[in-house]
Amino acid sequence: MLRLFRFDVLETSTKDTERPNSKSSRLSSTSGSSHPSSSSRLTVRSAVPEKSAFGSIEFIFYFSVILSILTIACFKIHYVSSPKHPNYKNIEKYLKPGWLFGQKVDSADFQYSAFRENMPILLLVIIVYNFLWRLVKLVFTKNTNDELAIKNNYRLCFSLLFALLVYGTGVIYVLTIALINYLISKSLKNSIFNPLLTWTLDISVVFFKEYFAYCKFSSLHPGLGFLDQYTGILERWYVLFNITMLRLVSFNMDYYWSLKHNSEKLNTLIFDKDREPTTLTFRERVDYSCLDEDYNLKNFLTYIFYAPLYLAGPIISFNNFMSQMKYPTVSTLKYRNLLYAIRFLVCVLTMEFLLHYAYVTAISKDGNWNQYSAVESAMISFIVLFMTWLKLLIPWRLFRLWSLIDDIEPPENIVRCMCNNYSAVGFWRAWHRSFNRWLIRYIYVPLGGSNHSILNLFIIFTFVALWHDISWELFAWGWLIVLFILPERLCCFMSRRTGLTKHPYYRYISGFGAALNIYFMIICNLIGFAVGIDGIKNVLVSFFLTLKGAMSAIAAFIMFFSAVQIMFQIRVNEEEEGINLRC
């Protein structure tokens, strides 16, 4: 049972150790300071007790506080979701018949509801994909030793068919944009116009993607009108194009850097330095360039349309993807994929339980906050945020599980529970981890890294908001995160400069600041992903400007402080095991 929750179930590269003379170590030493919050790790180490203390009276008190408040929260959520509540009649329209003990299910989140309904189809596709591969392997690999080449051809063929099934003739638009990107990279090579045109084209498509709704084949030529009838499962191909855009930039930039800097090749590392391919670290697979001939059209199309990761990610760079097509990763953990599948199932069942017993999404969608007390509003908001985290986690892990079964290991998008974060930067690293790594590699470091950190953070989170969708809520979310990151970084810097980190009570001082940080992060993410700007006004007024609300805010702060002390200790235990997630 304990094996199920080991970190190497999530990611093979989590416990990779960098070799002191490797290129990855040199890159780490130069770019580590360029990371948006390399200082946050120091805060953790300084702020924690030196040995595990979960059995001490202090930590028993912390656990008691958290358990007490969570018990109250459960009763409150059960009440607001029951027919006894006065506002139940207004949220009932968002409820559908469920399968769990006669309870109705909350279907107010249309995006997750659509995924939930189509999950059996996706599972069937995964089974068919692996069955067909075994059939192809049986037929075509009898007289050849080049099994990997055949598998890569199979990946390409299936991925193109999968894209056609999903988008129908809309895949023609995606293919056209992809080929234009490929022509840019191949014609401009190491010219500065390669990245300039790549970024201009792809950001323009993301920005104006809604206009593609009005673009029909019949408007190009009446004879092409029949193509408009075959729209596929997802009629609007441009809705999920954002993920494809990241891959297009990755291919062009990796190819550009391989030529521009005459980067050392991965094959050189393996053969000239006598390295076993199975010992390659994640960083080495990303930083070392592929051979020039690997940046070809077939590999490009396989990477862009790779079926397991096509719809939602996680994001994997072209260099990493190509290296794994040639030298697959090997986990040292027995039955790793099975354990990962069990963890995925636990997440799905947790979500199902919440959807059947906590109708917080329906309450949030209804928006009638006046019907709820300050405590209830706070509990509803927190559970909405937790379910937002879960609704992203589940699709990411399903598609990543498919990829793992296919011997391609992308980064794990979420390595910590939402409730196990106290740093704004650490939270971002652990929330959409593969996207965070993409941002660092393709935006933050090229723009100068920590030399212009504040400006770069503003640019990055503006891009992230634009990438998600063009809305004031998301722009407010991005800019508020930058605003809240600045005092966190300033406090970390001043603590080290003044020697406060050596103070015996620094753990408690740091815990106080981290508890405030949690408040800020909850507010930001509620604005961006849950209740919006209008909704957050009602929550904040009821929570901070009423007597009962203020008392609840104090109780929540005590719980956050207690939780932070436990988070500190968790990270101490991880470091003792050689795990440093830097979040």
Swiss-Prot record:
Q: Per UniProt, what is the membrane topology?
A: Multi-pass membrane protein
Region feature Disordered, mapped onto this chain: 15-42
Q: Does the keyword Acyltransferase apply?
A: yes
Q: Provide Extracellular-side residue ranges.
A: 1-52, 141-159, 213-298, 365-373, 534-549
Compartments where found: Cell membrane; Endoplasmic reticulum membrane; Mitochondrion membrane
Residue intervals annotated with topology Cytoplasmic:
74-119, 181-191, 320-343, 395-444, 487-512, 571-583
**UniProt keywords, alphabetically:** Acyltransferase, Cell membrane, Endoplasmic reticulum, Membrane, Mitochondrion, Transferase, Transmembrane, Transmembrane helix
Transmembrane spans: 53-73, 120-140, 160-180, 192-212, 299-319, 344-364, 374-394, 445-465, 466-486, 513-533, 550-570
Please provide the Gene Ontology terms (biological process) for this protein: GPI anchor biosynthetic process
State the active site.
H468
User: Has the keyword NADP been applied to this entry?
Assistant: no
Q: Where is the composition biased (Low complexity)?
A: 22-40
A single Pfam family, by name?
Answer: MBOAT
Which GO-annotated molecular functions does the record name? O-acyltransferase activity
GO CC terms for this protein?
cytosol; endoplasmic reticulum; endoplasmic reticulum membrane; mitochondrial membrane; plasma membrane
UniProt function note: Membrane-bound O-acyltransferase involved in the remodeling of glycosylphosphatidylinositol (GPI) anchors. Acts only on GPI-anchored proteins, but not on free GPI lipids. Also involved in lipid metabolism, having profound effects on sphingolipid-sterol-ordered domains integrity and assembly. Involved in cell integrity and apoptosis.
The entry assigns this protein to a family as follows: Belongs to the membrane-bound acyltransferase family.
Name of the protein: Membrane-bound O-acyltransferase gup1
